[in-house]
Amino acid sequence: MIDAKSEHKIAPWKIEEVNALKELLKSSSIIALIDMMEVPAVQLQEIRDKIRDQMTLKMSRNTLMKRAIEEVAEETGNPEFAKLVDYMDKGAAIIATEMNPFKLYKTLDESKSPAPVKGGAVAPCDIEIKAGSTGMPPGPFLSELKAVGLPAAIDKGKIGIKEDTVVVKEGEVVSQKLSVVLSALGIKPVTVGLNVLGVYEDGIIYTESDLKIDEEEFIGKIQKAYTSAFNLSVNAVIPTSATVETIVQKAFNDAKAVSVESAFVTDKTADAILGKAYAQMIAVAGLAGDDALDEDLKGKISSGAAAPVEEAPVEEQKEEKKEEAAPSAGLGMLF
């Protein structure tokens, strides 16, 4: 807390501001420091309107925010919270929310918007001007375009660019003249928004690199892990609620295959065993000479008679298909 002896040396508004910041810091379980240094006023207002219902954003002086964080850490006996000040940067602000850090990062990232590049700024990428009409009438702007290296000319009463031209490459400094031209052409190569400096949750501070994940890649890894775990459970015969049906089906199919191969007759395998024996009989008969066959066998061989239709294998096939579909069905429950 602010020492009472020194209160007369501190402006009252600063004391009030620190107290307000402390109240905000204690109000939510998720506290984030964000960088808003390069965000123009118009874009900032748009962002605030987008996130208003999900979080509280408060701007203040870094010195006051630092003091508020340190005092809250001391009052709550939470030294880890005090480490949040290490992530503070010029132009920082505080966000208080109940949104988990990953969702918070995604929400802030999606709230970013394109903006013109300022003179003196470093180009974030190659900035290319496409060939075509600018829609502007002949005038001083033609000279401005040529001054920044654009092949401009009058075409059908309008100023046009004759060919695609890269006016500045990634990493190069954008001149003030080029900044004016790009703005006039409506080109916004910069993405502005609130950048995460650090997010505190339950004793852990996450940085932007921790929170920035490829969702498709992450989901793919989860799906792969699920499928591997499913197959391990089935093959190692470790029943779970997700795999017990497949394990039983596999055991049934394996037992049935053994029964058929060993000619062990049961009510489930009799048809398959007889069908197999019949097929083997026809195959052997086909290798024998005509003198060794009766007329019935000769007729069956010449007509290509098939073994009796067996219903069980069809059922088995369906079961196998069901087994193959089981992992993806389980994934459907996850996502």
Swiss-Prot record:
Residues 304-335 are annotated as: Disordered. GO terms for cellular component: cytosolic large ribosomal subunit. GO terms for biological process: cytoplasmic translation; ribosomal large subunit assembly. Signal peptide: none annotated. Pfam families: Ribosomal_L10, RL10P_insert. InterPro entries: Ribosomal_protein_uL10, Ribosomal_uL10, Ribosomal_uL10-like_insert, Ribosomal_uL10-like_insert_sf, Ribosomal_uL10-like_sf, Ribosomal_uL10_arc. Residues 315-325 have a biased composition (Basic and acidic residues). One of its GO terms (molecular function) is large ribosomal subunit rRNA binding. Keywords: Ribonucleoprotein, Ribosomal protein, RNA-binding, rRNA-binding. It comes from the Archaea. Coiled coil: none annotated. Part of the 50S ribosomal subunit. Forms part of the ribosomal stalk which helps the ribosome interact with GTP-bound translation factors. Forms a heptameric L10(L12)2(L12)2(L12)2 complex, where L10 forms an elongated spine to which the L12 dimers bind in a sequential fashion. Forms part of the ribosomal stalk, playing a central role in the interaction of the ribosome with GTP-bound translation factors. Belongs to the universal ribosomal protein uL10 family. This is Large ribosomal subunit protein uL10. It comes from Methanococcus maripaludis (strain C5 / ATCC BAA-1333).
